[in-house]
Amino acid sequence: MPCTLERNALSYSVAVRALCEFSAKVGDLDLRFTPSPTAQEGIEGHRRVVARRAAGYESEITLEGQFETLKVRGRADGYDPTCNRLEEIKTHRGDLSRQPANHRQLHWAQAKVYGWLMCQARQLPNIEVALVYLDVDSDGQTLISEHCTADELQAFFETQCQRFLAWAQGQEQRLAERKQGLQALGLPRIRRSARASDNSQKPCTRR
C-alpha cells in the first residue's frame, strides 16, 4: 500500500494523494509514465504554469476535510478566484494521448477531492475543476476541465473516504487478530519457562 496512514485513538489521518492512489486505483497503478519528467523538472514545470497565471492566482493552498473518523489533508496546486477554477497541475513529456487511463483517473480523483475541500473551505456552491498538463519539452499546456457542483464533489469525496476507511479498519482488525494469536501461542512458552525456573531453584539430591 503506497501511502502513509497515521492513526491515533480517535481518528485516521491521510494525505489527499495517498487517499486517491488507494481509492481510485483500477488495475495495476504503475505510476511510471515513460518517458516522464524528473522530480526537478516537475517542480520547475509547476512554477512555470503558476507564473503565467493572472494576478490574484493562489498556489499551494493548504486544505483539509473530515469524513467520520478520517481526516484528509493536502495542498492544492492552484486556484483562480476570477473564474472559480481549481487546478491540479501535472507535467509530462511527449504525447499526452499515450498516458495510461488509470493515471488520468488518479489525477481526476485528486482534483475532485481538492475541489470539494475548496468548496467546503470557501463555501462555494460549485467550482470548475481542471487538470493542467505541461509538456516540459515543448512548454505546451493542455487544460481539461469539468464544472462540478459542491454536492457532486462531496459525494465523490465521501465515496473515496468510505473505501479507504473500510480498508484501514479491516487492516487494523487483522493486525489485532494476529496479535491475539501470537499472544495465545506465547502463553505455553511462558508457562514452560516458569516451570523450568521453579525446577532450577530446587536443591540437588545426591545419590
List where the protein language model places each region.
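Short coil/turn segments at secondary-structure junctions
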Residues: F33, R98-Q99, P188
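ATP-dependent helicase/translocase motor core
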Residues: L124-R207
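Short acidic (Asp/Glu) and glycine-rich catalytic loops that position anionic groups and cofactors
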Residues: S23-L29, T91-R93, D137, Q180
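Short, well-ordered alpha-helical scaffold segments within catalytic/effector domains
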Residues: H46-R47, W108, K112-Y114, A194-T205
